[in-house]
Amino acid sequence: MTSVNAVLLGLVQAAGEFLPISSSAHLVLMPWLLGMEYQGLTYDIFLHLATLIAVLIYFRKEWFTIIKDGLTKPKTEEGKILWLLVLGTIPAAICGVLFEDWIETVFRSPFVIAAALIVFAVILHLADKRAGQKDVALNVKTVLIIGCAQALALMPGVSRSGITITAALFLGFSRAESAKISFLLSTPIIAGAAVLKLKDINPADINAAFIAGFLTAAIFGWLFIKFLMNYVQKHNFNIFVVYRIALGVIIIITALMK
């Protein structure tokens, strides 16, 4: 793998992980569209570790408080957040352990990915209209709904950030609250997935290109988080809806022409 390819894949991972456009769809489609070979599990793990570092650094103050309060005063409203986030991770974790390999095999078709991009873009658009319409809080019910929605992101094209933001918007959270919940909920699931796969890392695969991709994913991951958190303060999610639909249409046309 060249350094250019590594940087490109790192950039795609960073954008797709934190923007509601589906990193898995882009990483699956790039080899198909551009003729790039699959870079292997070691590189996938490196990219996920990079995005984990990005979200931990950006929300370092929040996570410090969440963990401290969760361990020292778990019965308070502040202390419950840690355990709610853990609870919200369970549905996706269970589905990932049981069905990830099957899902990645069955749903890697370009047509399926395109359909997921388009269908869930429309759902995001509908949810966006409900942003901030209710006085809602993070509790067992809301976090389980968002957590169950997160499990759908195992299918390429759905988007983990997209589906969790969509679920939060449908519940009545504001756009900024929905994005923050999505990012906080992503931390344990990304960490868990990376830790489970660490044993599969082949040190012989690690080279300068891998490091370049890792740094790209970490740096741009942080930048994309910052961008989205600022963007949703004044804008809706329509730009991502349009992008997803356009990409889905392009994929379908390209697949039919091949």
Swiss-Prot record:
Per the record, the major location class is membrane
Q: Which cysteines in this chain are paired by disulphide bridges?
A: none
Topology class, membrane: Multi-pass membrane protein
Annotated catalysed reactions: di-trans,octa-cis-undecaprenyl diphosphate + H2O = di-trans,octa-cis-undecaprenyl phosphate + phosphate + H(+)
Q: Where does this one sit in the cell? A: Cell membrane
Molecular function terms from GO:
undecaprenyl-diphosphatase activity
Keyword Oxidoreductase present in the record's keywords: the answer is no
What are its GO cellular component terms?
A: plasma membrane
Enumerate the UniProt keywords alphabetically: Antibiotic resistance, Cell membrane, Cell shape, Cell wall biogenesis/degradation, Hydrolase, Membrane, Peptidoglycan synthesis, Transmembrane, Transmembrane helix
Annotated TM spans: 14-34, 39-59, 79-99, 106-126, 136-156, 176-196, 209-229, 237-257
Give the enzyme's main class according to its UniProt record, as a single word: hydrolase
Q: Note on file?
A: Bacitracin is thought to be involved in the inhibition of peptidoglycan synthesis by sequestering undecaprenyl diphosphate, thereby reducing the pool of lipid carrier available.
Please give the function described in this protein's UniProt entry. Answer: Catalyzes the dephosphorylation of undecaprenyl diphosphate (UPP). Confers resistance to bacitracin.
Return the protein name.
Answer: Undecaprenyl-diphosphatase
In the record, what lineage is assigned to the organism producing the protein?
Bacteria, Pseudomonadati, Elusimicrobiota, Elusimicrobia, Elusimicrobiales
